[in-house]
């Protein structure tokens, strides 16, 4: 029974709950970034280079068997080696956007933390003040 109570104490500790909330929000945010990349950015890039669907961009590295369709999935199922760079490009763009957004959030957080006023230094103890006064009066003699 001791292990269960230890686990409950661990699980309800603030840091674990904060981490769980962060993971859930991060997963939802990842879906938003995926949508921004797949639905907004990649179609614009595809319009510029002439292809709308990056996932279908690949290079066949060997001759496919006769009668094999030339789609990426069909070639993979047939065991034909393909260099499928389209999906990789989408994931790289996705990563760069996510990394930039996280950078902006951390930067804003650091600026807010730096803007907080620093605590005033603590006043010296009364003994130190008295000793300084004695020192100063001895210097003037």
Curated annotation (Swiss-Prot):
SUPFAM superfamilies per record: Gated mechanosensitive channel (SSF81330)
Topology term for the membrane: Multi-pass membrane protein
GO (cellular component) term, any one: plasma membrane
InterPro entries linked to this entry: Mechanosensitive_channel_CS, MS_channel, MSC/AndL, MscL_channel
Predominant location category: membrane
HAMAP family named in the record: MscL
Name by which UniProt lists this protein: Large-conductance mechanosensitive channel
UniProt organism field: Cupriavidus necator (strain ATCC 17699 / DSM 428 / KCTC 22496 / NCIMB 10442 / H16 / Stanier 337) (Ralstonia eutropha)
Name of the gene this protein is made from: mscL
